[in-house]
């Protein structure tokens, strides 16, 4: 057995033991998670920032834009296992997450059953987004990550509803911030091209910024800071 496997087995045993003491486990977890997250991001940067970036970097990016634009609500498409909801639910006053898969939706309901500021919706985000946007109380941060990626994910009418999502959000009267994951996929399958996204933003929000950096499309009012995530390189226009 390798040292790496032995270390993982030991860590799992320690975690199981600590879970017998929930209060202590929560305290230690809150201290260890930020450290692990910073290590993941540092390792990724040392390796040349390969695409896609780690989950930890995506969460730092969301947090950076939340602070820069002082946003209280987060809307996510593609709940999946609920890791983004878990990472952000204490930072936003309200978190809305839409999931197409009935199984993943039910699992998320169980995971966040007692979280009053978390609203989970089941269905196609292309159909639900208009209602969600209409119910928001002011500008929100949108994390668009709802797409078919094989495995346990669900497939709607299209591989991705992002075109319709963007049209609805950009047509809103509020100055929302939109972050779209997996920029590398655009131009393939049902994804619009990056040029098409730029054209859409220019038509509906001509005074907004539309840039891509580290596999994330960032769309937001130009009047606010561009580099919202800690340690980001200058963004590159689409």
Question: Which ranges hold each PLM region?
Answer:
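A short alpha-helical cap/connector motif
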Residues: 2-141, 147-238
């Amino acid at each position: 057995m390798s040292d790496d496997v032995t270390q993982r087995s030991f860590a799992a045993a320690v975690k199981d033991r600590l879970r017998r003491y929930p209060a202590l486990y929560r305290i230690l977890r809150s201290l260890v998670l930020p450290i692990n997250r910073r290590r993941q991001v540092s390792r990724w940067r040392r390796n040349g920032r390969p695409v896609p970036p780690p989950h930890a970097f995506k969460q730092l990016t969301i947090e950076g834009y939340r602070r820069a634009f002082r946003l209280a609500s987060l809307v996510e498409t593609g709940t999946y296992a609920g890791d983004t909801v878990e990472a952000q639910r204490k930072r936003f006053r309200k978190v809305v997450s839409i999931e197409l898969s009935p199984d993943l939706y039910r699992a998320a309901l169980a995971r966040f059953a007692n979280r009053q500021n978390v609203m989970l919706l089941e269905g196609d985000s292309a159909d639900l987004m208009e209602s969600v946007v209409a119910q928001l109380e002011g500008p929100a941060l949108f994390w668009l990550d709802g797409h078919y990626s094989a495995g346990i994910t669900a497939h709607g009418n299209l591989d991705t509803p992002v075109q319709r999502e963007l049209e609805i959000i950009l047509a809103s009267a509020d100055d929302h911030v939109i972050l779209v994951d997996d920029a590398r996929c655009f131009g393939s399958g049902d994804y619009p091209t990056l040029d098409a996204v730029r054209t859409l933003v220019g038509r509906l929000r001509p005074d907004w910024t539309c840039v891509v950096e580290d596999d994330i499309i960032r769309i937001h009012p130009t009047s606010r800071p561009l580099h919202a995530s800690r340690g980001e390189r200058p963004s590159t226009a689409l």
